[in-house]
């Protein structure tokens, strides 16, 4: 059900402020039966105190049984039906980087990968190289591959192993499959067209993959490329129109900036490299008076999960916990903390498991949950929600929705 027409009628502008904190991939699993999840293992005194004053529940970001990508996971949290509002990873990266991304272009998100002499993937992220190394290799590709046939090829560094390619030319469509096999020990997949109009794009992506491998054959780690999320430039309703909000985003990585800009948020500058939590906190404080909705993104919880680093993920949760008192001191009227999906270190991948949701607002019903963990969230008064149900709940608690019906 598309609630946007209803919410447009009910939404009203008020001075109350909403803060949505997304701990990327926060949900986890025990490493062994009976053990703690990452959240349960973390020492989080500030989150524990907050949980005692809040309501908790579980949230299925997209749909039961589906392991969502960050795109649909986030869009659902912002209230956009992820089955109706679909956007590829390439477009999100292009929007987040502020790339020269035009109507008719096809953008692809790339990972530099390490391939063995037989062409099989050894490391899907090339050892997470420094961004400076990425920039060096991208410069090499820009010089060597300005075009594929009559199509212009634009390369952009994103961060670490991530990069962006934009294809510009006549007759390009974006219905092509990914080349990332999603596991090691296999060669990169061939891009395949999902409709007749996209056959040219699929062929060009395969030619580009081969050419990149030729150019980078002497690189010790970054000697191959995996592509996913081929997409053209989308157009979505803006949060200002639907919710009557003045929204801002505080994120470091281009994909999340792209998601935010796609739905109408102003992306605030953040000082520092990587996840830059101190820089994000500074941006939040400096801009607190200018907006009534803030999206605050924490990335490294997800990265540690994907790397299979259980203790690293625990540490990232604890780092966030240490910042929480300064965030709470700003006095948001409504505060939500959740994730866009689960990334258990045990699985080294996104999973279908629900994530915990914490909600602090003036008019909550108390519950018995005492920690921000998966197990405690099952006891919470919020019950079990789907991702798209979160935004109406936040708006209601902030006094931003009128009564529905007579």
UniProtKB/Swiss-Prot annotation:
One of its GO terms (molecular function) is phosphoglycerate mutase activity. Keywords: Glycolysis, Isomerase. The keyword Iron-sulfur does not apply. CDD domains: iPGM_like (cd16011). It comes from the Bacteria. Catalyzes the interconversion of 2-phosphoglycerate and 3-phosphoglycerate. This is Probable 2,3-bisphosphoglycerate-independent phosphoglycerate mutase. The lineage of its organism: Bacteria, Thermotogati, Deinococcota, Deinococci, Thermales.
């Amino acid at each position: 059900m598309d609630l946007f027409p209803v919410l447009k009628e009910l939404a009203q502008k008020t001075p109350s402020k909403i803060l949505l904190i997304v701990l990327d991939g926060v949900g986890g699993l025990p490493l062994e039966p009976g053990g703690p999840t990452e959240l349960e293992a973390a020492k989080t005194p500030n989150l524990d105190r907050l949980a005692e004053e809040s309501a908790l529940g579980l949230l299925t970001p997209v749909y039961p049984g589906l392991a969502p990508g960050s795109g649909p996971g986030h869009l659902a949290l912002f209230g956009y039906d992820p089955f109706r509002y679909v956007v590829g990873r390439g477009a999100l990266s292009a929007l987040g980087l502020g790339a020269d991304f035009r109507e008719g272009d096809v953008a692809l998100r790339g990972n530099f990968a390490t391939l063995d002499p037989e062409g099989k993937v050894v490391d899907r992220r090339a050892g997470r190289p420094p961004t400076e190394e990425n920039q060096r290799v991208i410069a090499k590709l820009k010089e060597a591959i300005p075009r594929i046939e009559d199509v212009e090829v634009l390369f952009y560094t994103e961060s670490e192993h991530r990069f962006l390619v934009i294809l510009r030319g006549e007759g390009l469509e974006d219905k092509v499959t990914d080349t990332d096999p999603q596991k090691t020990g296999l060669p990169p997949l061939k891009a395949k067209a999902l409709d007749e109009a996209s056959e040219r794009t699929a062929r060009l992506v395969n030619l580009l993959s081969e050419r990149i491998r030729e150019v980078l054959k002497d690189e010790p780690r970054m000697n191959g490329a995996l592509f996913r999320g081929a997409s053209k430039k989308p157009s979505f309703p803006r949060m200002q129109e639907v919710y009557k909000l003045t929204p801002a985003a505080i994120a470091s990585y281009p994909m999340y900036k792209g998601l935010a800009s796609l739905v109408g948020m102003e992306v605030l500058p953040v000082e520092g490299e990587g996840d830059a939590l101190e820089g994000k906190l500074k941006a939040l404080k400096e801009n607190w008076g200018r907006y009534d909705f803030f999206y605050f993104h924490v990335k490294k919880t997800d990265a540690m999960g994907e790397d299979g680093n259980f203790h690293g993920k625990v540490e990232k949760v604890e780092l966030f916990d240490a910042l929480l008192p300064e965030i709470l001191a700003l006095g948001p009227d409504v505060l939500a903390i959740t994730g866009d999906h689960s990334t258990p270190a045990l699985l080294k991948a996104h999973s279908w498991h629900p994530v915990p949701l914490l909600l602090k607002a003036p008019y909550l019903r108390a519950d018995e949950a005492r920690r921000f963990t998966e197990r405690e969230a099952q006891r919470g008064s919020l019950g079990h929600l789907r991702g798209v149900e979160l935004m109406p709940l936040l708006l209601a608690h902030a006094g931003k929705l009128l009564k529905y019906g007579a």
